[in-house]
């Protein structure tokens, strides 16, 4: 049981951060194991609600890979991946849209709203929020990359205190839908709305200097050194695209990007409101 003096100490430590980030926008990518664990999900919803209640303006971006796989299997469609990307034909894209927009998005909205905060679920199709094009040579089918974010839809929602919850689907000018990596969507949205922070919830502690050794966690790094980590292959495999999207967001004006372990309960608050943080912060 936490004693009163410890509670006061925690609140005292959080106060300057609450004052600093009140009125600022923070984009959070929600994904990984946290989406599969009821206790972690509930903690995340409360964390987002708390951020909103102290004046921070959170925006949530989500994917939903495991749920997509479940529905593909139910419909006897085998999920296919190449180089870590889902091969998305037209039939698969229909399932992706159904699951992300109609199921996962609304589950998140419902969870946040139950806390007393007001979330609004939208996709990248709404108001042409996320414009996209086919990724690379098209070998992955309807997998896309962001070409433009139109923040006009988000600005009035944020100004009125709503919490936008955005599924990572974009479309071309011709209305062709694309399945887009949620990390990169989060980075581009953060840049487009001039966010103070981009935070990626992952299944790792953050950037590690030594393979999978959690004791080698890099707590803080600047943009220049983050690029060097990539050049030296210190950052590789699944951490590579996450670090790249952070770098791109910082290069477009986001003040700081964080890669944190979503498997730790209340990791979002621990990263934002404590002196030591819990993951890796990349500064511009």
Curated annotation (Swiss-Prot):
Residues the record marks as site: Transition state stabilizer: 29, 242
Predominant place of localization: cytoplasm
SUPFAM superfamilies tied to this protein: Carbamate kinase-like (SSF53633)
EC number(s) reported in the record: 2.7.2.8
Reaction(s) catalysed by this chain's protein: N-acetyl-L-glutamate + ATP = N-acetyl-L-glutamyl 5-phosphate + ADP
GO cellular component: cytoplasm
GO biological process: arginine biosynthetic process via ornithine; L-arginine biosynthetic process
Key words, A-Z: Amino-acid biosynthesis, Arginine biosynthesis, ATP-binding, Cytoplasm, Kinase, Nucleotide-binding, Transferase
Gene Ontology molecular functions: acetylglutamate kinase activity; ATP binding
Binding-site list for substrate: 64-65, 86, 179
Chain's role: Catalyzes the ATP-dependent phosphorylation of N-acetyl-L-glutamate.
Record family assignment: Belongs to the acetylglutamate kinase family. ArgB subfamily.
Name of this protein: Acetylglutamate kinase
UniProt lineage: Bacteria, Bacillati, Cyanobacteriota, Cyanophyceae, Synechococcales
Gene name as annotated: argB
């Amino acid at each position: 049981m936490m004693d009163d003096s410890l509670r006061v100490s925690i609140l005292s430590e959080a106060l300057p951060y609450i004052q600093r980030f009140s009125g600022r926008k923070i984009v959070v990518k929600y994904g990984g194991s946290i989406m599969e664990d009821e206790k972690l999900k509930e903690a995340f919803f409360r964390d987002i609600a708390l951020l909103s209640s102290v004046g921070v303006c959170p925006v949530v971006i989500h994917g939903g890979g495991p749920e997509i796989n479940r529905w593909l299997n139910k419909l006897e469609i085998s999920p296919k991946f190449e180089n870590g990307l889902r091969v998305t034909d037209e039939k698969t894209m229909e399932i992706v849209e159904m699951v992300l927009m109609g199921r996962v998005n609304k589950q998140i909205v419902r969870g946040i709203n139950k806390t007393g905060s007001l979330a609004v679920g939208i996709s990248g199709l709404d108001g042409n929020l996320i414009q996209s094009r086919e990724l690379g040579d098209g070998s992955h089918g309807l997998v896309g990359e962001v070409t433009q974010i139109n923040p006009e839809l988000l600005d009035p929602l944020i100004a009125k205190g709503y919490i936008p919850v955005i599924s990572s689907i974009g479309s071309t000018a011709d209305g062709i839908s694309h399945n887009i990596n949620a990390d990169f969507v989060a980075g581009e949205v953060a840049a487009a709305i001039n966010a103070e922070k981009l935070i990626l919830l992952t299944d790792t502690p953050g950037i590690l200097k030594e393979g999978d050794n959690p004791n080698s966690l890099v707590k803080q790094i600047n943009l220049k050194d983050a690029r060097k980590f990539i050049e030296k292959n210190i950052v590789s495999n699944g951490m590579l695209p996450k670090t790249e999207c952070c770098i791109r967001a910082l290069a477009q004006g986001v003040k700081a990007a964080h890669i944190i372990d979503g498997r730790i309960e209340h990791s979002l608050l621990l990263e934002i409101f404590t002196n030591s943080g819990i993951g890796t912060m990349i500064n511009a």
